[in-house]
């Protein structure tokens, strides 16, 4: 219970601080995004939902089954956006983790786009409350090329505790498409190794 109270206070204070940094004259509406990640793992199946909310510089995020199974995390961050030829969004964040794993995690998300090429990364370092031996570095990186507005393909890498193999980083191929506010991306990881698996990510923004 103490851990939950500490995490809640940190997230609330972080969000309040970030919101107070800049209040533009013209307020922009909230932008929301929901991802449902379906992991088709050999002899197992896992759903990893993610909810994101952005307003101006403020970024809020909630995840389940991300840092660990049956584990919830809540995040507050600050968006840095800009660029002309190379467009970028960089979001440092702070998160609290509660469930089978409990702790606090600094994190970072960034996207760099140049013409049809894009690199997206989300990473964090979890400091476990119970044992320093359970500290863990997470990372998910996608490098894609989009020949048009509705199709993309590329490569991906994940470092996670959800699925353990002989590989420290799960590596794979991806392809996806978009229709209006919806996106669907398919991943095939560890092809050619002993334990390949499939990930389908369904996303909607509004």
What are these language model-derived features?
Residues 30-31, 38-44, 57, 66-70, ...:
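Outer-membrane beta-barrel transmembrane domain signature
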Residues 46-48:
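Conserved internal helical-beta-strand scaffold that buttresses enzyme catalytic cores
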Residues 72-96:
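Glycine/small-residue-rich loop that forms an oxyanion/phosphate-binding "nest" at active or ligand-binding sites
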Residues 21-29, 81-88, 150:
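Short loop/turn motifs that connect adjacent beta-strands in outer-membrane beta-barrel proteins
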């Amino acid at each position: 219970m103490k851990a939950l109270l500490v995490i809640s206070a940190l997230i609330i204070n972080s969000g309040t601080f970030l919101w107070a940094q800049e209040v533009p004259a013209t307020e922009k509406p909230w932008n929301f995004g929901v991802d449902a990640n379906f992991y088709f793992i050999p002899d197992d199946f896992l759903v990893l939902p993610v909810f994101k909310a952005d307003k101006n510089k403020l970024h809020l995020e909630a995840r389940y089954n991300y840092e660990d199974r049956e584990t919830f995390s809540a995040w507050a961050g600050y968006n840095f956006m800009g660029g002309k030829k190379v467009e970028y969004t960089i979001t440092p964040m702070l998160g609290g983790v509660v469930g089978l794993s409990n702790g606090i995690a600094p994190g970072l998300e960034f996207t760099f786009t140049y013409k049809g090429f894009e690199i997206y990364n989300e990473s964090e370092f979890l400091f476990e409350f119970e044992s320093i031996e359970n500290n863990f570095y997470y990372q998910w990186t996608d490098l894609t090329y989009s020949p048009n507005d509705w199709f993309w393909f590329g490569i991906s890498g994940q470092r996670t505790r959800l699925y353990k193999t002989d590989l420290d980083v799960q590596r794979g191929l991806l392809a996806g498409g978009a229709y209006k506010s919806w996106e669907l991306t398919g991943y095939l990881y560890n092809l050619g190794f002993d334990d390949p698996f499939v990930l389908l990510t369904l996303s909607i923004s509004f």
